[in-house]
Amino acid sequence: MAFLKKSLFLVLFLGLVSLSICDEEKRENEDEENQEDDEQSEMRRGLRSKIWLWVLLMIWQESNKFKKM
């Protein structure tokens, strides 16, 4: 009976350890994916700001053309 308890305890302990390792790896993978998503969103934000800057520059240039006339 004591042997069965020890064996069961060992199996449960090893199962718990393997689950915690899998959870840790899963969290690391999710963190990497989130970091990649953050980098992509930063790139999009930078692109949007450049586009807006270009649009504003074009509007400003057009308004200066009309002022000179």
Curated annotation (Swiss-Prot):
Propiece span(s): 23-45
Signal sequence region: 1-22
Region: Disordered, residue numbers: 25-45
Tissue distribution: Expressed by the skin glands.
Effect on the protein of changing residue 65 to R: In DRS S9r3; shows high inhibitory activity against HIV
Chain segments annotated as transmembrane: none
Places the protein is found: Secreted; Target cell membrane
Tree of life domain: Eukaryota
Location, primary (coarse class): secreted
Example of a GO cellular component annotation carried by this entry: other organism cell membrane
Effect of residue 50 to R: In DRS S9r3; shows high inhibitory activity against HIV
GO biological process: chemotaxis; defense response to bacterium; innate immune response
Residue ranges, compositional bias (Acidic residues): 30-40
Note: The mutant DRS S9r3 shows antiviral activity against HIV.
Function: Atypical cationic antimicrobial peptide with potent activity against Gram-negative and Gram-positive bacteria. Acts by inducing permeabilization of bacterial membrane. In vitro, also shows chemoattractant activity, which is mediated through a G protein-coupled receptor (probably FPR2 coupled to the ERK1/2 MAPK kinase pathway). Has slow-kinetic self-association and amyloid-like properties that modulate its activity.
Complex formation: Monomer and/or weakly self-associated, oligomer, and amyloid-like fibril. Can adopt a monomeric nonamphipathic alpha-helical conformation, possibly with the aid of its cationic N- and C-termini, when bound to anionic membranes. Forms stable and ordered beta-sheet aggregates in aqueous environment or when bound to anionic or zwitterionic phospholipid vesicles.
Family recorded in the similarity comment: Belongs to the frog skin active peptide (FSAP) family.
Descriptive protein name: Atypical cationic antimicrobial peptide
